[in-house]
Every structure is written in structure tokens, then in C-alpha cells.
Amino acid sequence: MKEEVLGLPIDKIEKKIKEYDFSPRISNIGYVKHVGDGVAEVSLLNSAFIGEMVVFESGIQGMVLSLKEDSVGVILFGKDEYVKEGDVVYSTSKILQVPTGNGFLGRVIDPLGNPIDGGGLIFPEAYVPIDNEAPSIFDREPVKEPLYTGIRTIDALIPIGHGQRELILGDRQTGKTTIALDTIISQKNYGTICIYVAIAQKRTNIARIVQTLREYGALSNTIVIATFPDEPPALRYIAPMAGCAMGEYFMRQGERVLIVYDDLTKHANTYREVALLLRRVPGREAYPGDIFYLHAHLLERAAKLNKRLGGGALTALPIAETLSGEISTYIPTNLISITDGQIYLDTNLFNAGIRPAINVGLSVSRVGGSAQPKGMRQVAGRLRLDLAQYREYAMFLEFGTELDMATKKKIERGRRVEELLKQGAHEVQPIEEQIISFYLANGGFLDNYPVEKVKDVVIKYIAYLKLKYSSVLTFLREELQLSDQIIYQLHNIFQEFEKEVYANSTGS
């Protein structure tokens, strides 16, 4: 075995030393004029550019974020107590880079790639700039490969594809993060690499999220990038860009990547804080004038690459917080206009016990059925119609209106569909089981059962299939469509299932 130092083979270290250029270098230096609140004003850095990394004499790193005639504004990646007026600042003429690689999977890190989970050193495979150009039109291909969230409402009515950007928005405590975590948990079965970017989150929340991912076996294919409210604003500002850069590295290798930004409302607030500290001219609601560009540039980096570039994909799930259900405020409307659709979580539905509290009427996926398997398309169209009719007719019930039998039947069907769409946290369901569930609802197989027993019937029926007819589930998993033969089998098996399991309890 080769001798190692700090986990690296001796021959690699020797090679690096030989390759290093020891010749003198000309370096542009400046001096700190003023420092405070995580930002510094530096003079004499005349050749500095936006996004350049600089180093203070104490070793603290920073990034240039504003340019003036006689000085530049720098955000600090460390505590400003280690920087004082008159300190020397060294220009690097480089864009900030972050480490990435497979070694980061299963770890919790800060936006600079430093581990913060006590798990030891991470040896990167590469360093990548945090700011890259989005793939061009010619580098992309249409979004048509489905990304399964395991959430019935989303996979059936608001389908997401690899390479898409789908916004999740709603008030506080309505389940936005839960939807993102469930989507990550679902990816463990499909080999998708996940990156969860937590922006200004409490440490207790991060610990709970990491524990949830570990408990459900999804942490091993996930990188958690965490920033906290008491950290320098610079770390909170670069967090989504750093996560995106790491995701792009895997995408360029042909991998499918999912990145969650939780949340961009806090990121916008951080950018506003930094911009005001740097004395930049405020715009609407005191946000900088380029806040729209900042988020558009970030989210445009999500893409489905064509086969010439490896066919990788980066899917973005940004999260935004609304206040009192108002989605027409500045940041949410910006993000709605940038993304390829939104999933809106309704406080009233949440309080009524409907989980996930997705308002189907205000939610949309602009990719639509092109990112949905044929089997789901076969059942989802009827599902949406039944649900829409139910909610329309249910309004008349509130006024005690007399309804004919056909209308009552539609209402009863709608109640069962709505019950079927309810789903507990982290109860993700494979796509083939979802297709079967909706087939039963559409076909009227559940009409004779009380609403409160609908989910129990479906769960037991799927368990019955696994036990006696696993080939049906295997076919659906592989072919993802309801052929005539499979429909015939599902129908006959359900009759057999009823006789064996529900012979004496139907309708009770």
C-alpha cells in the first residue's frame, strides 16, 4: 500500500509540488477603509471585478460585490472582528470556487465546502466556480423524463420532469419543506443525486432534516448545504449559487441532479441586507434593482442537457414563503414568472386536515403531460375532472340545494378521490402503486366503501398484489402503462380480493 499524508498518496503530493510555479507574481493589493456588519470597504483595488475573491491579511476570504470610483465593497466569509481598518487586502483575480465530488454525498457542509457535521475531512474531486453561464438553447433538450416525487397529487396533477424548475410556495408551516424532503426521499430509488440548500435555517431544523433523510435512507445520495441566521450574510448569499455549482458538476458527468433552495425569500432578504450595507441604490421594497436577474440567472442554470453533452439534468425546486396567502407580492411573483410552474400550499386546506395542502386550482406545471408516463396520463385526466366537478358541486351542498342522483354520485366519487390524495409526511409511494390507486378510484371500485376506508382498501389491495400477483406490479414498474391485459387482470384480481378480504365488510 502506498504511503499517505492527510489521506493523499505521497506520489500525488510530490507531483503537485513539482507542478507548482514558484516564480514571483505581481499582486494587486488594497487597504480596508471601513469594516462592519459582515462587509468591508476596500481602497486601491482598481482592477477588481464583481464576483472576484479577495483575501485579507488575517486569512479571511471575501468577495467583491460592488464597485465605486475609489473603492470596492466586499462581503466577508468570516467574522468581521478579525478584520480591521488599514489591513492589507490581496486580489486573486479569480472567481470564487467551491469544492465538489462524490465525497460530499451524505455530508453537511457550509457553502464553501467545509464540513460542519463532525464527520472529518472531505477530499474534493474538483473545484468549480460558483457562477457559470446557463446552458444555451442548443445545449438543452426538451424536459420529458419524469421526476417522481412519490406524492400522489403532484405526480398525477402537477407532474415534474428532470431539468424543470418548479416553485413551491405558501405561508409558514404549511408543509413546503416536507414536500421537498419527500421528493428527495423518493429519489433514493431512482439514483438521482440530491442537494438541499438551507438558507438562514435554525440549527434545530437542520438537525431534524438530516435525521429525517438518514432515517429514510436518503442521506447517502444527498449533500446538505447549511447556513444559519447568525452567520455572516456572505455565506447566506452564496449558498444557492454554491449548491448550483456542485449540482452542475454532477450534471456535466451525465447524472440526474435535484436541488432544493429553502428558501429564496430568505435569500432575497439576505441580498437586500448586503446591498443596503454596501450602500447600493434600493429599488422596490428596498430590494436591489437586480434581484430579479439574480434569481433568474440562478434558476436558468437548471437544465436537461442533450445527449452530446452527456444527457445529465439539474432540476430545481425553489421554495418561497408567502404572507397571509398573498402570492402577488414582489419576490413570489418574480419567482412564478421565472419558473416552469408552481405548487401552491393553501393554509385553509392545511387547517382543514388536507395534507399535502396543495391548492390544485392555483398550482400548475408548464411541462405538463410530456413529463408523465403513459400509465399516469391514462388515469390523471379523469382524476382532475372528477376533482374539479366535486369541488364545484360541493358548493351547492352548503346551501342545502336538492341534487339529482347523477350529481350526488359525482360528489361521492370526488370525496373518495380527495381522500385518496391525502398523504402523510414522508409516506412516498412508487409510481406503479399510484397508477393502481387512481385506476381504482376512476373505475368506481371504491364507490361502495365509506370515504374513511378508501385508503385502507387501496393499501390492502396493493399488499394483496405484492403477495400473489407481483408480476402485475413489475409490469407497471417497467412499462408504466395500463394495457388492456393489465386492466383486465386488475379488475379480476380486485373481485378476488374483495371476496377474500372484504367479503363481509363491503359498505360497512
UniProtKB/Swiss-Prot annotation:
GO cellular component: plasma membrane; proton-transporting ATP synthase complex
Coiled-coil intervals: none
InterPro entries, per the entry: ATP_synth_asu-like_sf (IPR023366), ATP_synth_asu_C (IPR000793), ATP_synth_asu_C_sf (IPR038376), ATP_synth_F1_a_nt-bd_dom (IPR033732), ATP_synth_F1_asu (IPR005294), ATPase_a/bsu_AS (IPR020003), ATPase_F1/V1/A1_a/bsu_N (IPR004100), ATPase_F1/V1/A1_a/bsu_N_sf (IPR036121)
Biological process terms in GO annotation: proton motive force-driven ATP synthesis
Site positions (Required for activity): S363
EC id: 7.1.2.2
Membrane topology of this protein: Peripheral membrane protein
Positions with a binding annotation for ATP: G170, D171, R172, Q173, T174, G175, K176, T177
Signal peptide start and end residues: none
Compartments where located: Cell inner membrane
Keyword Glycosyltransferase appears in the UniProt entry: no
PROSITE patterns reported for this sequence: ATPASE_ALPHA_BETA
Record keywords: ATP synthesis, ATP-binding, Cell inner membrane, Cell membrane, CF(1), Hydrogen ion transport, Ion transport, Membrane, Nucleotide-binding, Translocase, Transport
Reaction(s) catalysed by this chain's protein: ATP + H2O + 4 H(+)(in) = ADP + phosphate + 5 H(+)(out)
GO MF term (any one): ATP binding
Pfam family, one: ATP-synt_ab_N
Quaternary state and interactors: F-type ATPases have 2 components, CF(1) - the catalytic core - and CF(0) - the membrane proton channel. CF(1) has five subunits: alpha(3), beta(3), gamma(1), delta(1), epsilon(1). CF(0) has three main subunits: a(1), b(2) and c(9-12). The alpha and beta chains form an alternating ring which encloses part of the gamma chain. CF(1) is attached to CF(0) by a central stalk formed by the gamma and epsilon chains, while a peripheral stalk is formed by the delta and b chains.
HAMAP family associated with the record: ATP_synth_alpha_bact (MF_01346)
Family that this chain belongs to: Belongs to the ATPase alpha/beta chains family.
Free-text function comment from the UniProt entry: Produces ATP from ADP in the presence of a proton gradient across the membrane. The alpha chain is a regulatory subunit.
Protein name: ATP synthase subunit alpha
